[in-house]
C-alpha cells in the first residue's frame, strides 16, 4: 500500500497531459473533456466534477509544469514568476478547499488506484507551495535548491579488507571482527549533518523546503520516511531551529482498482472494476530485486519497471503486472536516441528514432544522452513482422489547444482491422488500459474513439494489448500565415532535465525524499545531485 501511495504521483496524471497548451490561459483540470464521459469514467457526481473543473486563475502552462511534480522540470525565474502570482496562489488554495467540501468522501480511480477525489488538487497545491516558497529576503528557495549538490551515504572503502599480495598491513583492523560487514552503514555515516556542510543544511531555504517535503500529502509510511523525520530533527537541533510539522495521514489512498468498489454521491449501486494482467504477473520477493536484477530476470526495460512499480528502486510489495518479456540491451556510454536507433538497425530493417521511442516509452534520461546502465528494449524483428517507417507528423495548435494533425502517421506497432487510414496519432495500448483510460488520456469520448477505431464493440471488450490505437484523425489543412507549425516524430523530448538511473554515474535525484534509499543499493561511489549540478563522491577512507 505504501508504494502504491508513493506511485500515485506518477500514475494518476495520465489524465492531465492536455495542460501543455500553445497560449497562456487560465487553468481548468478537465477543460477539454466531455462531461458525461467523465462522470461515467471517474464515477463522480456532477457536483464534485464541477468543483474539480473550476477555472483556476493561473497561467495554464505554468500550472501544467506542476502535474508530474515540481522536481521534474528545471525551473527558470520566468517560470516561477508566471506561476507564483498572488491571484494564482490564492485561486489554487480556494480550489483545493472547495473540492474538499463538495467532493467530501467520494472516490475515483486514477492509474489503477482508488483515491479520494479531494486528493486531485493536492499535487498542484503541494508542488506550488514548493516552487513559490521564498525566504525572508524574498529569494525563491526552489530556484536556489536547483544548484545544491547532494551526496551518497559515507561508505567503507570497498578494498579495505583486501591484502596487497602477501602484505597484510593494508587490511583495516575492522576486518578482523567476524561481525563486521563492509556494507553496513552506521547512523553517523547516514547522518545528513555529516553529508552536508552546516552552511547548507542550516540555510533558511534548505530547512523550509525540507519541512515542506515532509508535508507531502502522499508521503508513505515507511522506514525511509522515519529516517527523513529523524534527520530533520537532527538538522534542527544542529541549527537551533524549531519548525513545527506533521506528516499527512494515509487517508487519501483507498485501494487498488482490482475488485474495489467505487462510490459517488449520486451512485445507488456498487460498481466493481477488475483488472486482468495480459503480461507477466510477478510476485514480490522477501529479498526484493534491484531494478537491474528485476529487468534481467523478467526481460523488461528499466523505464517500464520504474513506472509500473512507481518506485525508483523498483520495489513492490504485492503481485504486479509487468509487460511480456522482450529482448533487452544494457545501454552504456550515454548514447543518444538517434545513436541507439542506428545501433539496433540491421541489414534488412532500418530502425528510426520514433520506433525506438515507441518500444521505450519510458526511456530514462534525455534523448541527447540517455542514462547509462539502464535496460532498453530492442527488437530483432519488428512487431507484426515489419519495421514501419513513420513519417514526421505535422501538428499545429487547434482551436482548443489540442494538436491538429495534417498528415497521416504510420503506426509503430500493429493495428487492428478497422483502424481508420487517415489517423494523425497513435497510442500503444499497455497493461491496465481500457477505453475509458484512453479516452481520458486524450480528451476523447467513446463515440470518437469508436469513430477512429471502428472495430471497437460497445463494451470495449476487444481492445488488444501491445497494439496501436488511433487517438486523433487527420484534419484537412487550411491556409494560414499566423500558425507556427512544429514537426514531431514520436513525442516531445525534455532536453533540459534527464531522469537518470541511480545505479550509474552521474545520477539525478529528483527530490529530497529520493536522496538516500536508492543509493544504498549502489556498490560503487556515485554522483548525485539535488538539483542539476553533479559532483563526484569519493568512498570513505578508513
Curated annotation (Swiss-Prot):
PANTHER family: AM15 (PTHR34997), PEPTIDOGLYCAN-BINDING LYSIN DOMAIN (PTHR34997:SF1)
InterPro entries: LysM1-like (IPR052210), LysM_dom (IPR018392), LysM_dom_sf (IPR036779)
Record organism: Penicillium expansum (Blue mold rot fungus)
Residues annotated as glycosylated: 53, 59, 168, 223, 238, 299, 346, 391, 445
Domain-level remarks: The LysM (lysin motif) domains are small globular domains involved in binding chitin in eukaryotes. LysM4 contains 2 LysM domains.
Keyword Repeat part of the UniProt annotation: yes
Keyword terms, alphabetized: Chitin-binding, Glycoprotein, Repeat, Signal, Virulence
Protein name: Secreted LysM effector LysM4
Function (record text): Might have a role in sequestration of chitin oligosaccharides (breakdown products of fungal cell walls that are released during invasion and act as triggers of host immunity) to dampen host defense.
Segment forming the signal sequence: 1-24
Deletion consequences: Does not affect radial growth rate and colony morphology, nor lesion development on apples.
UniProt-recorded Gene Ontology molecular function terms: chitin binding
Stretches assigned to the LysM domain: 327-378, 425-471
Similarity comment text for this entry: Belongs to the secreted LysM effector family.
Cross-referenced SUPFAM superfamilies: LysM domain
Induction: Highly expressed during the infection and development of decay of apple fruit.
Other remarks on this protein: In plants, chitin acts as a microbe-associated molecular pattern (MAMP) that is recognized by lysin motif (LysM)-containing plant cell surface-localized pattern recognition receptors (PRRs) that activate a plethora of downstream immune responses.
Amino acid at each position: 500500500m505504501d508504494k502504491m501511495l508513493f506511485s500515485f504521483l506518477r500514475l494518476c496524471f495520465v489524465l492531465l497531459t492536455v495542460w501543455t497548451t500553445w497560449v497562456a490561459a487560465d487553468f481548468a483540470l478537465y477543460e477539454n473533456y466531455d462531461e458525461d464521459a467523465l462522470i461515467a469514467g471517474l464515477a463522480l457526481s456532477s457536483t464534485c466534477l464541477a468543483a474539480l473543473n473550476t477555472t483556476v486563475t493561473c497561467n495554464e502552462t505554468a500550472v501544467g509544469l506542476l502535474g508530474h511534480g515540481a522536481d521534474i522540470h528545471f525551473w527558470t525565474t520566468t517560470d516561477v514568476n508566471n506561476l507564483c502570482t498572488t491571484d494564482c496562489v490564492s485561486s489554487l488554495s480556494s480550489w483545493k478547499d472547495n473540492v474538499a467540501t463538495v467532493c467530501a468522501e467520494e472516490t475515483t480511480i486514477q492509474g489503477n488506484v482508488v483515491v479520494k477525489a479531494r486528493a486531485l488538487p493536492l499535487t498542484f497545491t503541494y508542488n506550488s507551495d514548493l516552487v513559490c516558497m521564498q525566504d525572508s529576503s524574498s529569494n525563491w528557495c526552489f530556484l536556489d535548491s536547483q544548484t545544491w549538490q547532494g551526496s551518497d551515504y559515507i561508505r567503507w572503502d570497498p578494498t579495505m579488507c583486501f591484502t596487497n599480495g602477501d602484505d597484510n598491513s593494508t587490511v583495516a583492523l575492522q576486518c578482523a571482527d567476524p561481525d563486521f560487514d563492509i556494507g553496513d552503514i552506521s547512523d553517523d555515516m547516514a547522518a545528513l549533518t555529516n553529508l552536508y556542510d552546516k552552511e547548507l543544511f542550516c540555510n533558511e531555504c534548505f530547512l523550509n523546503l525540507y519541512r515542506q517535503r515532509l508535508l507531502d500529502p502522499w508521503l508513505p509510511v515507511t522506514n525511509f520516511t522515519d529516517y527523513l523525520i529523524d534527520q530533520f530533527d537532527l538538522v534542527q537541533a544542529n541549527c537551533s531551529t524549531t519548525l513545527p510539522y506533521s506528516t499527512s495521514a494515509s487517508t487519501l489512498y483507498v485501494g487498488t482498482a482490482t475488485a474495489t468498489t467505487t462510490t459517488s454521491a449520486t451512485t445507488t449501486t456498487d460498481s466493481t472494476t477488475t483488472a486482468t494482467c495480459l503480461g507477466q504477473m510477478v510476485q514480490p520477493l522477501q529479498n526484493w530485486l534491484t531494478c537491474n536484477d528485476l529487468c534481467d530476470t523478467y526481460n523488461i526495460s528499466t523505464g517500464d519497471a520504474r513506472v509500473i512499480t512507481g518506485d525508483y528502486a523498483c520495489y513492490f510489495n504485492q503481485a504486479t503486472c509487468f509487460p511480456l518479456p522482450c529482448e533487452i540491451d544494457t545501454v552504456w556510454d550515454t548514447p543518444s536516441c538517434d545513436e541507439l536507433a542506428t545501433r539496433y538497425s540491421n541489414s534488412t530493417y532500418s530502425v528510426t528514432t520514433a520506433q525506438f521511442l515507441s518500444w521505450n516509452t519510458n526511456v530514462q534520461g534525455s534523448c541527447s544522452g540517455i542514462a547509462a546502465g539502464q535496460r532498453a528494449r530492442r527488437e530483432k524483428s519488428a512487431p507484426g513482422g515489419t519495421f514501419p517507417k513513420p513519417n514526421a507528423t505535422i501538428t499545429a495548435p487547434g482551436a482548443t489547444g489540442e494538436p491538429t494533425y495534417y498528415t497521416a502517421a504510420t503506426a509503430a506497432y500493429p493495428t487492428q482491422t478497422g483502424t481508420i487510414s487517415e489517423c494523425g496519432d497513435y497510442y500503444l495500448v499497455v497493461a491496465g488500459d481500457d477505453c475509458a483510460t484512453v479516452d481520458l488520456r486524450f480528451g476523447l469520448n467513446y463515440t470518437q474513439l469508436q469513430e477512429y477505431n471502428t472495430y471497437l464493440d460497445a463494451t470495449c471488450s476487444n481492445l488488444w494489448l501491445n497494439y496501436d490505437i488511433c487517438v486523433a484523425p487527420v484534419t484537412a489543412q487550411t491556409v494560414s500565415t499566423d500558425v507556427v507549425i512544429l514537426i514531431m516524430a514520436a513525442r516531445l523530448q525534455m532536453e533540459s532535465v534527464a531522469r537518470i538511473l541511480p545505479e550509474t554515474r552521474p545520477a539525478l535525484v529528483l527530490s529530497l525524499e529520493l536522496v538516500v534509499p536508492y543509493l544504498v543499493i549502489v556498490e560503487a561511489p556515485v554522483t548525485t545531485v539535488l538539483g542539476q549540478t553533479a559532483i563526484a563522491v569519493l568512498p570513505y577512507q578508513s
